[in-house]
Amino acid sequence: MSRYSVLSLLKNAVGGHKGWERAWRDPEPKPEYDVIIVGGGGHGLATAYYLAKLYGVTNVAVLEKGYLGGGNTGRNTTILRSNYLASGNTLFYEKSMRLWEGLSQDLNFNVMMSQRGQLNLGHSDAQMTVLKRRGNTMRLNGIDADILDLEQVRKIAPYFDYSPNARFPIYGALWQGRAGIARHDAVAWGYARGADGYGVDLIQNCEVTGFIKEGEKVVGVETTRG
């Protein structure tokens, strides 16, 4: 698999973008694999990628009944954040945030992550107390968090209704500046290309219709392609 670069972009632009190689193969299913992953969305593709990259498990098939990234991965909020209340959740999602921040470089594929920040608005004194607790949990775990007053919120988002007579008056907010969004289909494509580069078979239009068992152990799958 060739790496994407400014040079390759210029070269293919001059050639009318007709020389790009396929981002991943379209293989026929093999009779046997060490690992079979059902579902070619973000979770399935990422699992295949990290199995291959981190553990050297490459005899892997990802079976997708439709097209890669066409399920829940293509229908979600795309929000990336680690601003949770429970320490376990906060640390788990912060680990994910750090992976996101280097994901485009790791995959050599632009997942279009944009760290534009996230505001959680407080509409009462009680809600502000909860947001402060969450912010303190984040800070204690070394995660960026700021509690903003009304004027600070107004500077970030000037088009809200700041009237005290608004149905949900704004008291302040919890702000995580590193939060943001990513392009969901680019994430799926990046993981697909990365997994394929390690030899993982990505098999589309292959619905799993049943599991083959020996006792309580699953030893295979039945699919629409054999």
Protein language model features and the residues they cover:
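Extreme N-terminal leader/targeting segments of oxidoreductases
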Residues: 1-35, 50-58
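Short gly/ser/thr-rich secondary-structure transition/capping motifs
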Residues: 15-23, 45, 216-221
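Hydrophobic Val/Ile/Leu positions in short beta-strands of Rossmann-like dinucleotide-binding domains
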Residues: 37-38, 62
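Glycine-rich Rossmann-fold phosphate-binding loop(s) that bind the pyrophosphate
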Residues: 40-45, 65
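Glycine-rich FAD pyrophosphate-binding loop
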Residues: 52-74
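Dinucleotide-binding Rossmann-like beta1-alpha1 core, especially the glycine-rich loop
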Residues: 77-159
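A short, glycine/Asx- and small/polar-enriched loop/turn
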Residues: 126, 156-170, 212-220
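Helical element adjacent to the flavin cofactor pocket in flavoenzyme catalytic cores
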Residues: 174-226
